[in-house]
């Protein structure tokens, strides 16, 4: 049995990462990013998920989250987002991505013709304030390290936009202190 990435204390904040299969660039359109943010909002309102920080990159996202049913909430978030992405991509003329999501579907995934997300979400419990600050810095600076922006607050699809610049964010975070 795998034990490296498990949620043992769901109310504890966890750093999570979810990636698109084969690192395909799904989140290169505003609408696909917005689908993920809508799913965050749904899980906050209906499942008690707290989202303390987040960033969306072209093929994955990172977040710091907590909630009473964390594994189920993340699973539902990914299912909802996958359905929306599969509906949205053809509208954007990105049928090639839909074809890739079908091609790279894991053989044991028989309930769908496509697989959008890699399995799992790699939860890491945040046990100290120092660890929280390190994960916040990692999330904030991900677009900077990729060379997409000069400063974290310039990335629209990340919580640094709100926290560091005081700008209206695409999705507002829950306080962690």
Regions found by a protein language model. Name each.
Residues 1-177:
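Short catalytic/metal-binding and nucleic-acid-binding patches
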